[in-house]
Each structure stands twice: as structure tokens, then as C-alpha cells.
């Protein structure tokens, strides 16, 4: 049976003053082994050469479409605009400073089709501003358990139009964690497939979460998301509860809250997790090494 390569994949690329790495990002889409795609570049009022670069690519490839907002929408609304224009059977988005590996779209699409799944995510390599490897975000089946309290998805993912229509738009009130909120909403409705292979390069550089105010906003909003989506997970076991309270505890810890309301439950479930999982795994490794 041959590979199914005719489903249209819509890739939304939000841009804001991304001239430095934009060509690398677009080139990584063009280099995909899966060629049935459309790239929608959503320019959120850039003041650098992003417009010029995007229009250059649009003129060269009729699969690339450039749109410029009349006013700055910020990321969640910009994504929503992009997906409202998308025509694909499968949807994803990337960033103006990140890069796909050549087989990323093909392998994620194949994973969804073969597993009859609605949402898939894959491992990423983290690179610095010069493109040098820093570390990895590794994905496996076990990591899905973490999604109730922390983000295992990374930046390499694909989901179906069916899932998009069921889950709806990205929440414009959740800037900085709009993606994690969306992954939780997708996961609670459809579950997820995973790919351990590294299919994406995610760039850490000076534009990341640097200011204290931005970090505080991130952790405050993340706590809000964890509390908001908890009920959708239904009944969870003790391991899931550990990850949930670990996420909440870390939010308050990073906000320097001396009266962290999640401390007791986090410590309780941390102890349980250590005894139930960490100790047996360590013993198993020691026995294997003998």
C-alpha cells in the first residue's frame, strides 16, 4: 500500500519582526518531503524586513500566502486568523525562528493516518541563536501522562481538521500559554499519538521569556490554565495527580509565593511518586546492569 501524500496540510506561520531567521523557517517548509501543503504567513505589523522577505517567497511559490494585519493582534488572535483562512485537512503552526526537519510533516501525517489519531507531537532539538544544539525535548508514550500539569508537546505537532472544529480557537486571553491550553483541550477530547524521532529545531535566544514581568505573567496564566482544564481530565490516578500538583506548585514557586497553597499536596504526591515509580525503576536498572 503506497503512502497517502495528497491530503492538504495547512501550516500557519505567525511573524512579528522575524527577519533574522524567517528565511530559515520558510526554507524548512519548502524542503519538506511531503509537498502537499500551504503556508500562510500572518504578519502582525512587523516593522523590519519581514514583509519584504515573505512577499519574495509568496511570489516564487503559489503554495505560500502572505497576509498583513492592520493592527497588532498578538499571537492567539493571529493564529486564529490564520486558521480561519486555512483550507487543509490537517493543521499546524510554526514560528518565524524555528525549523522543521525535512521529514517532519510526512512522518506526523503518516502517524495520524496509521493510528487513526487526531493529534500527534514529536521530539524537538533545542538550538541557540547560532543554530548550535543546546538540548532536546524528547517525546514518548509515557510523557503523555504529564500533560495534566506540564507541557510535553514542545513545538512539533499536527492535528486534524476534525479536532480543530471540535476544540475551537486558541484563547486570546491566554497569551504566552495559549498553546499549552490548546494541547490540554485537544488531549482531553482526542488523546494523542507520539513520535520519538527529532523532527523540529526550536530556537532559544534573547527574545525568549527574559523579563521578570513576562515570567510572572506566564506563571500566573499557566496556573489559570491548569485550574481551568482540570475537570476535563476526569478521574486521574496518583501519578497524574503528582504531575498536576507539580505544575501548580512550580507556578507559585516561580512567583516567589512563600505561602504556596499547593505545597502540601505536591510533597505528598512527590513522595508517593518516588516510592511507586522512581525506586522500582532504579532497582530495575541496577538489576539489568549486573
Language model segments and positions:
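A conserved acidic beta->alpha catalytic loop
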Residues: 35, 43-52, 71, 95
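Cell-envelope/extracellular polymer assembly enzymes that use nucleotide-activated donors
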Residues: 7-10, 38, 181
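Conserved nucleotide-sugar donor-binding catalytic segment
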Residues: 84, 122, 136, 141-225
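C-terminal subregions of glycosyltransferases and related glycan-biosynthesis enzymes
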Residues: 2-4, 181, 188, 203-290
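Short aromatic/hydrophobic "clamp" motif used to bind/position activated sugar donors
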Residues: 91
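Glycine-rich, basic loop-to-helix element that forms the pyrophosphate-binding segment
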Residues: 69-86
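N-proximal low-complexity "stem/linker" segments adjacent to membrane-targeting elements
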Residues: 1-30
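Conserved donor NDP-sugar-binding/catalytic core segment of glycosyltransferases
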Residues: 103-134
Amino acid at each position: 500500500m503506497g503512502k497517502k501524500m495528497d491530503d492538504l496540510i495547512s501550516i500557519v506561520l505567525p511573524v512579528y519582526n522575524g527577519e533574522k531567521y524567517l528565511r530559515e523557517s520558510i526554507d524548512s517548509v519548502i524542503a519538506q518531503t511531503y509537498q502537499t501543503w500551504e503556508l500562510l504567513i500572518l504578519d502582525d505589523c512587523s516593522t523590519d524586513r519581514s514583509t519584504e522577505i515573505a512577499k519574495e517567497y509568496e511570489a516564487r511559490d503559489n503554495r505560500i500566502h502572505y497576509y498583513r494585519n492592520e493592527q497588532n493582534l498578538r499571537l492567539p488572535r493571529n493564529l486564529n486568523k490564520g486558521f480561519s483562512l486555512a483550507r487543509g485537512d490537517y493543521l499546524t503552526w510554526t514560528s518565524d525562528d524555528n525549523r522543521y526537519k525535512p521529514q517532519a510533516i510526512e512522518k506526523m501525517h503518516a502517524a495520524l493516518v496509521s493510528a487513526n489519531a487526531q493529534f500527534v507531537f514529536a521530539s524537538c532539538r533545542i538550538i541557540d541563536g547560532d543554530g548550535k544544539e543546546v538540548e532536546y525535548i524528547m517525546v514518548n508514550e509515557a510523557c503523555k501522562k504529564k500533560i495534566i500539569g506540564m507541557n510535553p508537546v514542545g513545538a512539533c505537532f499536527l492535528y486534524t481538521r476534525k479536532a480543530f472544529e471540535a476544540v475551537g480557537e486558541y484563547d486570546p486571553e491566554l497569551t504566552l500559554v495559549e498553546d499549552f491550553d490548546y494541547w490540554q483541550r485537544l488531549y482531553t477530547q482526542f488523546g494523542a499519538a507520539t513520535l520519538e524521532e527529532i523532527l523540529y529545531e526550536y530556537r532559544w535566544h534573547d527574545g525568549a521569556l527574559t523579563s521578570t514581568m513576562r515570567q510572572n505573567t506566564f506563571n500566573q496564566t499557566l496556573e489559570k490554565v491548569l485550574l481551568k482544564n482540570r475537570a476535563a481530565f476526569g478521574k486521574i490516578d496518583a501519578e497524574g495527580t503528582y504531575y498536576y500538583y507539580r505544575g501548580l506548585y512550580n507556578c507559585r514557586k516561580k512567583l516567589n509565593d512563600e505561602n504556596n497553597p499547593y505545597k502540601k499536596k505536591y510533597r505528598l504526591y512527590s513522595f508517593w511518586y518516588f516510592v511507586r515509580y522512581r525506586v522500582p525503576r532504579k532497582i530495575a536498572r541496577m538489576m539489568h546492569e549486573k
